[in-house]
Amino acid sequence: MHNHHNGLKTAALFGVLWAVLLGLGAVIGSSMRSTTPIWIMALVGVGTTAYGYWNSDKLALRSMQAYPVTEEQAPQLYQIVRELSAKANQPMPRIYVSPTPAPNAFATGRNPQNAAVCCTEGILRLLSLRELRGVLGHELMHVYNRDILTSSVAAAVAGVITSVGQMLLIFGGGDRRNSNPLAVMAMALLAPLAAVVIQSAISRTREYDADEDGSALTGDPLALASALRKIHQGVQMVPLPPDQKLVNTSHLMIANPFRAGGVTRMFATHPPMQDRITRLELMAGGPAS
């Protein structure tokens, strides 16, 4: 459903991310005169990716202390999700609410048959039903475009690269016969940096696509634009604490859940909010009067 250019861009970024992982293994293997680290890097990457893929929903929901809600508890939420799921001819996801006052939402799960959508109590209080429908359209398109799989794989591979880089910095390559210690240390510093930049770029690309596809599903891009404006303001007033579990989940959320700081655009998991709003307004033919 999503933009063909963005699909190619995501595939290319994934290729570079895996190349960084294997390159890290190659540098270690070359310096230690062994190819074993290359295979270890590949196997760890595959194993971590598989774990992240199968458990992405549990990990994300647990990090936000989310609880399932019934249709009796949240009838309007169910009504919107059921309508949009039927319109997309897709199964109904499980619905959760997180008890945080910070306004946000995310979707998780390895495929549409095992998906969950979570809204915070803060976003349910903040948005109108029209705006909430725009947000849920965005989140459902993350599921239908398999973005949860994409982001989980990217996060897992980047996490492996970062962990290996940290170990190399601590142990210094480990082998006194190391023929090229400078190359190992340089890779230990640069590979995690590159991995985070690539993972962030993948995440930003998927956000743009979910905005576009979600607005096509709801037929109301201005509703999402209005919701994003409110969410951005709300997050600045009630940000999430920078807990590591929340940091690991933040790329799934519709907006960066932390207070704006000095992070450059290269490392941001979400596009600039004004860019997203402007794109949505262009989809609608201009801002609301």
Curated annotation (Swiss-Prot):
Gene Ontology molecular function: metalloendopeptidase activity; zinc ion binding
Q: Its membrane topology, per UniProt? A: Multi-pass membrane protein
TM ranges are 10-30, 34-54, 153-173, 182-202
Q: List the InterPro entries.
A: HtpX_protease (IPR050083), Pept_M48_protease_HtpX (IPR022919), Peptidase_M48 (IPR001915)
* Localization (cell): Cell membrane
Cofactors that this protein relies on: Zn(2+)
Give the highest taxon in the source lineage.
Bacteria
The Swiss-Prot or TrEMBL record describes its family as follows:
Belongs to the peptidase M48B family.
- Recorded protein name is Protease HtpX homolog
Q: From what organism does this protein derive? A: Arthrobacter sp. (strain FB24)
Q: Which UniProt keywords apply?
A: Cell membrane, Hydrolase, Membrane, Metal-binding, Metalloprotease, Protease, Transmembrane, Transmembrane helix, Zinc
Give the annotated active site.
139
Entry keyword annotation includes Secreted: no
